Amino acid sequence: MSYNNIRTISTQVIGIAVTATCLLFSLASFAQNSEMQAIEDSVIKIYTTQAAPDYFTPWRLLNPRQSSGSGSVIAGNQILTNAHVVANASYVQAQKHNDPQRYQARVTFISHEADLALITVDEPGFFSDLTALGIGALPDPHEEVSVYGYPMGGKTLSITKGILSRVEQQIYAHADAFLLAGQID
């Protein structure tokens, strides 16, 4: 075999190896993008109409106000959210990511002490194209994390990436209790 033939074969092998490597990176990127899309689709915007009790005249309610918050689809066709999002709610709606339609929802469980609540949507098919997100282990400090949600004042999904710099007990305003909280930098 001549030097030119060996050079051509080795160039072809290197070309195939580079192409295969790029393909692997593309597949990994595609898998990562589809996983991110599934997470984004499983984050729900929650709209509520709330009427808190008037503690000075307990037979009356304060004027209703509207607010919004975030929730995540979990197993059992449930949406996990914070109790402060649905506390004193007389009307609850859920809106999927990139879907203008709002669906009537109802609270199925609330724990003010843990500031957690479960809601569901009875509309047939609401959960059919959504992936239930699992509840994982507590991340380690210095681990990169992503936070998805609809913070106050935002109409579109917010995604924040950062490093979990610490996890410690902090007082939660809703329950006036010490619970675990993480700081992301």
Predicted features by range, described:
Residues 31-72, 79-82, 91, 140, ...:
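N-terminal activation segment of mature serine protease catalytic domains
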Residues 63-72, 130-136, 152, 181-185:
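Gly/Ser-rich catalytic serine loop of serine hydrolases
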Residues 52, 75-157:
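Conserved active-site neighborhood of the chymotrypsin/trypsin-like protease fold
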Residues 65, 99, 156, 178-180:
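Residue-level preference for beta-strand/loop junctions
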Residues 2-17:
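Bacterial N-terminal signal peptides that target proteins for export
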